[in-house]
């Protein structure tokens, strides 16, 4: 179980609701969100830039990157794609 943490401005660093974990930037915008089961990141996770713009989408299995990961540039275009297996990169495409 994650301990409750706050930024100095009182904004929560993260919040749990069921098995969903949401991390926040100090400005209150969402930094990352996904499933957190048995103290591990699982399934699809979405990461954002501090502006709120989509940055990365990827999957975890047992707290390790697994499957496709897609990173977006600041113009919302795919910057590159990677495929992971048990935390190790097995393929990268630009």
Give short role names for the model-derived ranges.
Residues 1-94:
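Glycine/tyrosine- and acidic-biased, solvent-exposed loop/turn segments at the edges of beta-strands
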């Amino acid at each position: 179980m994650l301990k409750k943490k706050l930024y100095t401005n009182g904004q929560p660093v993260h919040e749990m609701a069921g098995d969903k974990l949401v991390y926040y930037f100090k400005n209150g915008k969402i930094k990352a969100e996904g499933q957190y089961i048995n103290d591990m990141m699982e399934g699809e996770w979405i990461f954002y830039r501090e502006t709120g713009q989509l940055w990365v989408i990827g999957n975890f299995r047992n707290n390790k990157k697994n499957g496709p990961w897609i990173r977006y540039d600041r113009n919302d275009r795919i910057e590159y794609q990677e495929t992971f297996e048990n935390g190790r990169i097995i393929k990268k495409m630009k």
